[in-house]
């Protein structure tokens, strides 16, 4: 029974009839490092003891040696369709180390429980718990000294790729409705960066959107694996952010947005559509879209040394260093 496959989503994962889940990628991890890597040190800190969940915190080595160095704060949510990858994988450790070095910021990379064992909305709930934990440091009296001493809570940025970008959107919306810290008058978020955001719908978003039915069916099946209780499938407002009439973006809880998309990515039109909907919503901030020509989904993670990935990092770090 344990060898009989119920669902085969290779090269991502397999689910066996016994209920066992075999993830085929994104399971490797690397430890944090007290020795500088690219000028950055890191450590893991528990944010939810009840669920055994941690964040990985990154800090420029030079800031660690100073007691009064306040830096922008980046909170990052990893991608993987809500199903694969972790905050501790070599891919994300490398990306966050590079991001912190380029942006001269403090970063908190959030690990959350994954579907299908923990279906949506668990990844969103864990992410919100992590974000609230981060903001317990706003007065300088939180659990983690690196955040108490070095995080500038007037310059907080959220970012994520793919499913992580989806999480970022929902965190920014929720932050506009619920205070992240007592006494905080606004959301506490300066801006968000959505890297190849995972939004989708049953029907193409426009005439340029992919009409490949096989691909669209695969994406729907993958979503239903993560969110089996979604009555509307990929038209669930958690995923169909762009076309759903029930989703109002006017209350997005930040002042500026950077959306980064890739020309060959099936999700490219969703990113453009998100920005267009945001501009039309009555939201008062500024939004910019940057498209990487000739590239596919999360290419910047897969080949970080290519010219287009270097340009992505340049835009990414510039957004953070630009402040409010």
From Swiss-Prot:
Its EC number is 3.1.1.1. It is an enzyme of class 3 (hydrolase). One of its GO terms (cellular component) is cytosol. InterPro entries: AB_hydrolase_3, AB_hydrolase_fold, Carboxylest/Gibb_receptor, Lipase_GDXG_put_SER_AS. One of its GO terms (molecular function) is carboxylic ester hydrolase activity. A motif (Involved in the stabilization of the negatively charged intermediate by the formation of the oxyanion hole) lies at residues 78-80. This is Probable carboxylesterase 12. It comes from Arabidopsis thaliana. The lineage of its organism: Eukaryota, Viridiplantae, Streptophyta, Embryophyta, Tracheophyta. The gene is CXE12.
């Amino acid at each position: 029974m344990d060898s009989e496959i119920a669902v085969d989503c290779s090269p991502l994962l397999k689910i066996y009839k016994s209920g066992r889940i075999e993830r085929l990628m994104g399971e490797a991890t690397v430890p944090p490092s007290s020795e500088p890597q690219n000028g950055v040190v890191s450590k893991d800190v528990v944010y939810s003891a009840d669920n055994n969940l941690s964040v990985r915190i990154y800090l420029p080595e030079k800031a660690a040696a100073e007691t009064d160095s306040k830096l922008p704060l980046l909170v990052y949510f990893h991608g993987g369709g809500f199903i694969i990858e972790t905050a501790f994988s070599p891919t994300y450790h490398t990306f966050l180390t590079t991001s912190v070095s380029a942006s001269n910021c403090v970063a908190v990379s959030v690990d959350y429980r994954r579907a299908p064992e923990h279906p949506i909305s668990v990844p969103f709930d864990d992410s919100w718990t992590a974000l609230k934990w981060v903001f317990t440091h706003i007065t300088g009296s939180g659990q983690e000294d690196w955040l108490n001493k070095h995080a500038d809570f007037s310059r907080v940025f959220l970012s994520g790729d793919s499913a992580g970008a989806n999480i970022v959107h929902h965190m920014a919306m929720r932050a506009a409705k619920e205070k992240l810290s007592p006494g905080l008058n606004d959301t506490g978020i300066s801006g968000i960066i959505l890297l190849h955001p995972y939004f989708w719908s049953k029907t193409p978003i426009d005439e340029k959107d992919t009409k490949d039915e096989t691909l669209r069916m695969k994406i729907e099946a993958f979503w239903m694996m993560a969110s089996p209780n979604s009555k509307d499938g990929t038209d669930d407002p958690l995923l169909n952010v762009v076309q759903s009439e029930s989703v109002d973006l006017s209350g997005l809880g930040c002042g500026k947005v950077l959306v980064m998309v890739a020309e060959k990515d099936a999700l490219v039109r969703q990113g453009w559509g998100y920005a267009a909907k945001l501009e039309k919503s009555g939201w008062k901030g500024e939004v910019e879209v940057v498209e990487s020509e000739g590239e596919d989904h999360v290419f910047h993670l897969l080949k970080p040394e290519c010219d287009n990935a270097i340009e992505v990092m340049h835009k990414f770090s510039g957004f953070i260093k630009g402040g409010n």
